[in-house]
């Protein structure tokens, strides 16, 4: 999409997840392409593009799942258990809504740190976007960890999370141009074609074309 906008060179910048929006607004980069979940709170500090993908949550535990964790409710009901989560991730809010005590949450800067927390015993589980953490686990392949295949999705008002690119509020011109290119891909049905090689599916992850970022930011679809 950026090439279609005449942008030939893109320089990537690494950042802790919790520093993405602060870094964006500080001018360290021009857009966030991490599939960040659109939330009403984040909408106050950043200009999201239209939704690109929808997804559920996933859980990774110590091999053998010794604490028998299959849901956020299981973590809440086992007060001795701890869960590692990236700082600033929406999963923290989901966990709290499901009854997990804040003291049970180990905040970490990124996915490798969350895996390390579980492998070292500082946490019993880690959670994040289902396909993201599953793919990360498959690529790192640590014997100490396993993906919970029968994880029960949290009941967060019946809505999945919706991810999108994020732009500075004062750079809506780039956001609007990006949205135009995104709309073309949606109309041509190419989103599934682009995401399926990464393990996503049209059935589970392609967004309803009528869904808008405005409706998520307002809370209507959040």
Language-model features: locations:
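Ligand-binding cleft/hinge of the Venus flytrap
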Residues: 1-8, 89-109, 115, 137-142
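Extracytoplasmic small-molecule ligand-binding "clamshell" domains
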Residues: 1-35, 44
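Alpha-to-beta junction loops
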Residues: 7-9, 26-34, 80-82, 119-132, ...
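Ligand-binding clefts/hinges and TM-proximal coupling segments of bilobed small-molecule sensing domains
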Residues: 8, 90-103, 145-146, 177-222
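Short helix-initiation/N-cap motifs at beta->coil->alpha
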Residues: 10-22, 70, 106-120
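Flexible hinge/capping segments at coil-to-helix
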Residues: 50, 63-82
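Periplasmic-binding protein-like
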Residues: 53-58, 141-179, 202-222
């Amino acid at each position: 999409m950026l090439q279609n906008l005449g942008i030939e060179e893109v320089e990537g910048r690494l950042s802790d997840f919790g520093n993405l929006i602060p870094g964006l607004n500080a001018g360290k980069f021009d857009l966030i392409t991490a599939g960040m979940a659109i939330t009403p709170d984040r909408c106050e500090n950043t200009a999201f593009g239209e939704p690109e993908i929808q997804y559920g949550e996933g859980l990774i535990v110590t091999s053998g799942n010794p604490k028998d964790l299959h849901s956020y409710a299981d973590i809440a009901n086992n007060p001795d258990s701890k869960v590692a989560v990236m700082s600033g991730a929406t999963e923290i809010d989901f966990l709290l809504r499901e009854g997990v005590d804040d003291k049970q949450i180990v905040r970490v800067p990124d996915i490798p740190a969350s895996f390390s927390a579980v492998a070292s015993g500082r946490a019993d589980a880690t959670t994040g976007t289902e396909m993201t953490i599953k793919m990360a686990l498959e690529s790192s392949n640590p014997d100490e960890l396993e993906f919970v295949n029968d994880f029960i999705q949290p009941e967060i008002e019946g809505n999945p999370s919706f991810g999108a690119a994020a732009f500075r509020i004062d750079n809506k011109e780039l956001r609007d141009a990006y949205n135009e290119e995104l709309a073309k891909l949606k109309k041509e049905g190419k989103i599934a074609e682009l995401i399926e090689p990464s393990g996503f599916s049209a059935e589970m992850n392609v967004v309803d074309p009528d869904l808008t970022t405005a409706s998520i930011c307002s809370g209507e679809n959040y």
